[in-house]
Structure formats: C-alpha cells, structure tokens
Amino acid sequence: MHDQIIPCGMLVAIEGIDGAGKTTLARSLALKLRGVGLETVVSKEPTNGPWGTLLRQSAATGRFSPEEEVDVLLRDRRQHVEDLIVPMIGRGAVVILDRYFPSMVAYQGAAGLPVDALLEANAFAPRPDVLLLLDVPPAIGLQRIWERGSTPNHFETTENLSRCRDIFLALELPSKRVIDATANAETVFSAALGLVMEVLRVRLGALGAVVLERLAG
C-alpha cells in the first residue's frame, strides 16, 4: 500500500511539562497513522544532532545560562526545520514532534527570560497544525519520572515545573488544544487522535474518507 499524501503536509507538536506523557503519545499516534497508510515521521527536540546533544549534556550538569541555552536551542531548531521538518511537510508527510518551540518558551521563560522575546526568536519555525498540550500538575509529572526509573534533573523541580506549566497554559497559539493528561494513556490517546482527525478531515477532504474511517475504527 502506498502512503497517503496530505496536501501541504501536517505538523503535530506534543507539549507539556516533564512526565506528561509526550513520548508515549507521539509513538502511539505515529503507529496509528502509519497503520492507515499515512507517511509519518516522529522527531524530538532537542534533536540528536550536534546542538541538541550539546544541550542534553548541559542539562545533566547545569552549566549553561538561560541565554546560552536559548542560543543552542535556536541553532538546533533551525537545523531541525531545514533538514527534516520543512522537507517532510513538503512531501506531504505527517511530522510529529515530541517537544517544539513552545517548550523553549516555557522553560526559558520560567528561568526569567521574556516570553514575548522568546516567541519572536522562534518566528522562523513553522507553526503546528495542531499543538497538543498535555497538562498535568507537577507532582504527577515528577512521580511519573521517578516511576520510570529516572532521576529528575535541575529543571525538574516542583517550583520550576509549576512556572513552566503556567506559561504553557497561557500561551496564545491558535492551534493549541489542552488535554487532561492525568487520565490514562488510552484516554489521552483517544482525545489526541480526535483532534488530529479534525485537521486531517479538512486537509484530505472527500479523498480522505477511507483514511478517516480507518482511524476512527
């Protein structure tokens, strides 16, 4: 079966504080979309490229200042946009991102940098067709981090995650949809899939009826 092409492609960004379930949802959505013949690519930010790797190394040690982190994040994102996001959207694929520019706005904003300036710095980044914000209280996010066998880093404190959550919720982006991620993974997936299908219904039109029927099944 040939992959179904979506006119102009589709960009799905999954956001939320640490422990919200972003990676799980990204994988589940990709599996479902691929299963009905939609070419789907999953990526993440920071990426595995040189700038993203540098940032993750810094996150473990906390040696970068917020301003330095912004510089590295923007370099990583520009490369991501140029090398993967724009080309894949251009060929009609669904691109699912596990974190995108709203994470930088929330986390660096929580560190004290101006939110408006952070948004402006990301003006080059294509806006998502749907931005799925998985909302959980910090206590639940931290509990999930411990339960998966990880140790919270210097970003992952109740106070910092609370500030990040507030910024995420306050961001005024037209494609943002908030999902209660305190629910189980199946419920979150169902809600997210419904929101993705709304966009697909418009993009695919009558030609996508079969695809949408399979997704709903």
UniProtKB/Swiss-Prot annotation:
Keyword Kinase attributed: yes
Summary of the function given for this chain in its UniProt record: Phosphorylation of dTMP to form dTDP in both de novo and salvage pathways of dTTP synthesis.
EC numbers on record: 2.7.4.9
GO-annotated cellular components: cytosol
Keyword presence, Kinase: yes
InterPro entries: P-loop_NTPase, Thymidylate_kin-like_dom, Thymidylate_kinase
Catalyzed reactions per annotation: dTMP + ATP = dTDP + ADP
Pfam families for this protein: Thymidylate_kin
Source organism phylogeny: Bacteria, Pseudomonadati, Pseudomonadota, Gammaproteobacteria, Lysobacterales
Record-annotated membrane-spanning stretches: none
Coiled coil regions in record: none
Gene Ontology biological process terms in this record: dTDP biosynthetic process; dTTP biosynthetic process; dUDP biosynthetic process
PANTHER family: THYMIDYLATE KINASE, UMP-CMP KINASE 2, MITOCHONDRIAL
Keywords: ATP-binding, Kinase, Nucleotide biosynthesis, Nucleotide-binding, Transferase
Entry-linked Gene3D superfamilies: P-loop containing nucleotide triphosphate hydrolases (3.40.50.300)
Name this protein carries in UniProt: Thymidylate kinase
Family of the protein in this entry: Belongs to the thymidylate kinase family.
HAMAP family recorded: Thymidylate_kinase
Gene Ontology MF term list: ATP binding; dTMP kinase activity
Annotated residues for binding of ATP: 16-23
